């Protein structure tokens, strides 16, 4: 009996969400969506099919644009007639290369990938201890693998963009100015040295402003033209010069 009730609740919930989805559609604004990976605990390339379905469902209600175009639209307060979406992904996982990028290319758009350079270095140097600590302890994603610099360079040639995310996915909610300068400022230097292009974009690890404080925010704004968090998403701040 409990099993039947559970199934009925599931069916009712499914139908309710379907009807609610028909009533409520995304508002005609520009959205920059943030993700991390296709699957949290492994790198099964078949998961690209699931991401493809998610994109197909989203595309019914939203236009997809390149990341840099979305940034321009937001800064210039450009109006849009339909929900408009660009994509970012944090941490630099291998499925950014094997699954995410190939699916986005089918829609003719890129993404911004925010990278932790020391994680990518660990892949190139086969530093198993660092990769295990990063995946198990830092990001709670055991079984995942980093994107390599060669893969990033290939994606860069295909129009994808790369930003900074601190060297080690460092939680910047402290006042250790020396370490903050190292993690935030030196991250830009490494990104530019490895990829050969200016690195103007930075995203806070862990995503929200409570994971930062005035000191790291000031340092980030000193080193980067654009600084992203997941907080206060309805209020965009930019300089009067933009």
Q: Residue spans of the language-model regions?
A:
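C-terminal active-site subregion of NodB/CE4 polysaccharide deacetylases
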Residues: 1-88, 95, 174-242
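Active-site-adjacent pocket scaffolds in enzyme catalytic domains
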Residues: 2-12, 17, 101, 105-167, ...
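A short secondary-structure junction signal
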Residues: 124-125, 173-175
């Amino acid at each position: 009996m409990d099993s039947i009730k559970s199934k009925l609740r599931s069916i009712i919930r499914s139908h309710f969400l379907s009807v609610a989805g028909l009533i409520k559609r995304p508002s005609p604004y520009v959205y920059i969506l943030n993700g991390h990976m296709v699957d949290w605990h492994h790198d099964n390339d078949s998961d690209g099919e699931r991401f493809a379905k998610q994109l197909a469902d989203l595309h019914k209600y939203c236009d997809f644009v390149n990341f840099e175009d979305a940034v321009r639209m937001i800064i210039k307060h450009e109006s849009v007639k339909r929900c408009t979406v660009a994509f970012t992904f944090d941490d630099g996982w291998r499925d950014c290369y094997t699954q995410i990028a190939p699916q986005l290319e089918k829609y003719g758009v890129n993404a911004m990938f925010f990278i932790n350079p020391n994680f990518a270095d660990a892949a190139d140097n086969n530093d198993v201890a660092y990769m295990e600590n990063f995946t198990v302890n830092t990001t709670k994603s055991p079984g995942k693998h980093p994107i390599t610099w060669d893969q990033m360079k290939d994606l860069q040639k295909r129009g994808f963009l790369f930003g900074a995310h601190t060297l080690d996915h460092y939680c910047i909610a402290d006042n250790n100015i020396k370490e903050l300068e190292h993690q935030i400022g030196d991250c830009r230097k490494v990104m530019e040295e490895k990829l050969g292009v200016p690195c103007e974009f930075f995203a806070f690890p862990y995503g929200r402003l409570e994971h930062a404080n005035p000191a790291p925010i000031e340092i980030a704004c000193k080193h980067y033209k654009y600084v992203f968090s997941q907080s206060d998403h309805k209020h965009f701040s930019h300089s009067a010069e933009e």
